[in-house]
């Protein structure tokens, strides 16, 4: 997406799957409205993380992420989280992940699920790039360092696979995509069969907000 996010100035390009200021604000408002209308929430997750850097810090993205977690935690409505593909770093738990709140009923993964703090290549570069430069300048053999980097990448890859995520409790179950709809239907049915409280349809704000937004966009 060109010229997005706006806080990065001219020439900025938004990356799909990355969380920016507007997205965090919009999700925060949506969770608040779902809580008010007593609507259970299904989170579908494929994210490479929250935007980082000096511009992101000045735009208060960390504070907005904390605000989203606070809204989820205080919503009082049941929620499930499905990691469709990537669930990376803080973005994983601010998007309804089980690590960040007590409203998560359960979490599901797919055959493509990958949950980690960062990918192995990024971790290896962060840990060993300066050592590589230093050894290369000193004329020291860099192959042992490269071997360590490759070993770290393999370890990160192995510990972010769906089977490891299920074994270590990052997800409660790995589900085939054709069966995913049945899990969502069962969750929503349970939520409505035994609600902590209800909101009458004519008192709901969310349908009216969505309708007003669509009308505004068409105009």
For each of these PLM feature ranges, what is it?
Residues 1-219:
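Ligand-binding clefts of soluble mixed alpha/beta catalytic domains
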């Amino acid at each position: 997406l060109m010229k997005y996010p706006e806080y990065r100035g001219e020439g900025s390009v938004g990356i799909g799957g990355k969380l920016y200021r507007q997205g965090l604000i919009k999700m925060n408002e949506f969770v608040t409205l779902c809580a008010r209308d007593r609507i259970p929430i299904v989170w579908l997750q494929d994210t490479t993380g929250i935007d980082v850097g000096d511009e992101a810090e000045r735009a208060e993205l960390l504070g907005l992420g904390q605000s989203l977690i606070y809204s989820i935690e205080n919503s009082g409505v049941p929620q499930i989280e499905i990691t469709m593909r990537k669930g990376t770093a803080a973005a994983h738990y601010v998007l309804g992940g089980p690590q960040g709140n007590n409203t998560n009923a359960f979490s599901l993964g797919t055959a493509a699920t990958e949950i980690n703090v960062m990918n192995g290549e990024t971790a290896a570069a962060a840990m060993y790039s300066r050592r590589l430069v230093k050894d290369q300048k000193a004329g020291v053999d860099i192959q042992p360092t490269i071997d360590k980097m490759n070993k770290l990448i393999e370890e990160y890859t192995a510990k972010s696979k769906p089977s490891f995520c299920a074994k270590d409790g990052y997800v409660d179950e790995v589900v085939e995509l054709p069966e995913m709809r049945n899990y969502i239907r069962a969750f929503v049915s349970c939520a409505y069969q035994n609600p902590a409280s209800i909101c009458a349809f004519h008192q709901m704000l969310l349908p009216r907000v969505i309708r007003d937004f669509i009308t505004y966009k068409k105009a």
